From Swiss-Prot:
Quaternary organization: The RNAP catalytic core consists of 2 alpha, 1 beta, 1 beta' and 1 omega subunit. When a sigma factor is associated with the core the holoenzyme is formed, which can initiate transcription.
Molecular functions per Gene Ontology: DNA binding; DNA-directed RNA polymerase activity
Transmembrane segments: none
Protein name: DNA-directed RNA polymerase subunit omega
SMART domains (UniProt xref): RNA_pol_Rpb6
Amino acid sequence: MARVTVEDCIDKVDNRFELVLLASHRARQISQGSSITVDRDNDKNPVVALREIADETLSPDDLKEDLIHSLQKHVEVDEPEPDPVTLAASAADGEDDDQPETVTFDQMSEEELLAGIEGLVPPEKNDDY
């Protein structure tokens, strides 16, 4: 059985810390049932993940992208931005329509804010908490 070391993978992923992150993420994927792309040879999941990276059966960039998506709590959706020409045309046409007015916020000084906070009444204590 050939041993896979970090030196076998370091030419594929330049940073050792990034290599550890990618290999551990891939090992977790394997333990969750993802199919492996190399022969197992009775190796454990971290070794299989390192062998996949060393043999270039998986792209490190794809693994990095997948790792980032797995750590995101809010996924951004790329929506196409409207064309500026279309926006200008719709603004010119929409002047006659009943458009909601733009919302403006009042400005408050720090003293007014502090006075407002001091004037707040604390909620009554309840046994529910």
